[in-house]
C-alpha cells in the first residue's frame, strides 16, 4: 500500500512528526490546566456541531445551536433535529470512544444515532439506491464529480474497508495517523449511505483520532476548520478520487489536507493554553522534537 512503501513525501513526514510532538505536549499539560481544557471542550462542542452541519447546508442561528448542543431546548424543525442528532453522535464519541471499535456495526450505530431524530427511513442502514456526488458551479450548472460504489456492492466494500483498516492498524510499519485520512477517503468514495456521508466522515475522523491517541478534536473543532476551508477539502478529495475504482488513486493530497487541519487545531490549542496560562510556547520544544526525528 501507499503507506507501507517506506518513501513517503517529506511534507507528510514533517506534518506527522509535528502533530505527534504537539500531541505529546498537550497530554502533559492537562493536569495543570483542567479548567481551561473544560472551557475549550464546551466551545469546541458547539463549533463542531455547527461546522459539520453547515458544510451540508443544515443551519440555524448561533443562539439556537448553542441551546440545542447544551440541551436547553428541544429541536423545533427538521434542520434542528439533524443538528441534535449530530450532537448525540459526537457526544457518544467524546465520552465512549475507548469502547467504540471501528467496525461495520459501529459505523451503522453512529449513523443511526446521528439520523434517528430527523426520521430517516434508512437510519443506520446502507444505501438501497446508487448515488452520485454532484457539484454545482457558480453558473448553477450541475456535473458529476464522482460515481461512488453501487448500492449492491456497498456491503462488501464496507467489509473490505474495515478489514483493510484492521490489517494496516496492526502493521508496525504504518503510522496510525496517516492511516486515518486513507480510511476516510475510502469511506467517502464508497459513500455508503443515502444521506449523511459527509457528516459521518467527520465523526469517524474524530473517532479514529481518539482511538489512535490524538485527542485535539475534543478541545478544538476540526469540523469548523474544515468548514472554513471547504473548497480546499473538495479539491483535495476530487484529486484523490481519480483512479480510485481501479486502485490507482494517489491519496497524498487528501492526507496532506487532513494533516494540515489537525496540525492547525493543535497550534490553536497551544495558543489558547498559552494565552490563558502564560506559559512558554511549546513551538521550540516541537521544533527540536521534529528535528531529532527527521535528522
Where are these regions (language model features)?
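FIC/Doc superfamily catalytic core
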Residues: 1-295
